């Protein structure tokens, strides 16, 4: 958090935008939308070795409790409406991370008749994590980039 000034009385001065965004980055609660092998790497990133809890990232089972969705794997045409429905159930503000080549653009199954060529055709995506499947380190890096993006947004409308 960018601190504008520290007064001698023990007060810290900063803008409301910076404070609110700092609080949001320290408490991102993702909902997993694992569709294929990328979900295994997503579970690996949530295990003890990478410990996403240290970044304030705690996986939630319900879309109503989460503010971040991680779409991991091949998205089929039949799964598209379900993805949109789950996204619409999330409270505002909400963000989406697309994990893996299949979620980013169809991947290996790009030319199949039943595969959506990128989950950004269904929901707006904020961060893309490349790879087939991406490593747990790549997902952690993508989540840190998501935190940086949240820090730079304007929370209070001007």
Swiss-Prot record:
Keywords: 4Fe-4S, Cell inner membrane, Cell membrane, Iron, Iron-sulfur, Membrane, Metal-binding, NAD, Quinone, Translocase, Transport, Ubiquinone
Keyword Kinase recorded: no
Species name: Bordetella avium (strain 197N)
GO terms classed as biological process: aerobic respiration; electron transport coupled proton transport
Enzyme category, top tier: translocase
Lineage, opening ranks: Bacteria, Pseudomonadati, Pseudomonadota, Betaproteobacteria, Burkholderiales
Positions that bind [4Fe-4S] cluster: 37-38, 102, 132
Leader peptide range in chain numbering: none
Protein family (similarity comment): Belongs to the complex I 20 kDa subunit family.
Superkingdom of source: Bacteria
Membrane disposition: Peripheral membrane protein
Cellular component, GO annotation: plasma membrane; respiratory chain complex I
SUPFAM superfamilies: HydA/Nqo6-like
GO molecular function: 4 iron, 4 sulfur cluster binding; iron ion binding; NADH dehydrogenase (ubiquinone) activity; NADH:ubiquinone reductase (non-electrogenic) activity; quinone binding
Record-annotated membrane-spanning stretches: none
EC number: 7.1.1.-
PROSITE patterns listed in its UniProt record: COMPLEX1_20K
Protein name per its UniProtKB record: NADH-quinone oxidoreductase subunit B
Cofactor binding remark: Binds 1 [4Fe-4S] cluster.
Subunit structure as annotated in this protein's UniProt entry: NDH-1 is composed of 14 different subunits. Subunits NuoB, C, D, E, F, and G constitute the peripheral sector of the complex.
Cofactor(s), names only, from the UniProt record: [4Fe-4S] cluster
Reaction equations catalysed: a quinone + NADH + 5 H(+)(in) = a quinol + NAD(+) + 4 H(+)(out)
Location relative to the cell: Cell inner membrane
Pfam families: Oxidored_q6
Function, in words: NDH-1 shuttles electrons from NADH, via FMN and iron-sulfur (Fe-S) centers, to quinones in the respiratory chain. Couples the redox reaction to proton translocation (for every two electrons transferred, four hydrogen ions are translocated across the cytoplasmic membrane), and thus conserves the redox energy in a proton gradient.
């Amino acid at each position: 958090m960018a601190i504008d000034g520290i007064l001698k009385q023990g007060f810290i001065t900063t803008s409301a935008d910076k404070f609110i965004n700092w609080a949001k980055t320290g408490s991102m609660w993702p909902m997993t939308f694992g569709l294929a092998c990328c979900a295994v790497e997503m579970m690996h990133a949530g295990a003890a070795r990478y410990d996403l809890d240290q970044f304030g990232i705690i996986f939630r089972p319900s879309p109503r409790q989460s503010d971040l969705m991680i779409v991991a794997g091949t998205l089929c045409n039949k799964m598209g409406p379900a993805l949109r429905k789950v996204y619409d159930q999330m409270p505002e503000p909400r963000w989406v991370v697309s994990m893996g080549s299949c979620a980013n653009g169809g991947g290996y199954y790009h030319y199949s008749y039943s595969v959506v060529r990128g989950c950004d055709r269904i929901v707006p995506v904020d961060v893309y994590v490349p790879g087939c499947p991406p490593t747990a380190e790549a997902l952690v890096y993508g989540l840190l980039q998501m935190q940086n993006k949240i820090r730079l947004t304007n929370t209070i409308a001007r």
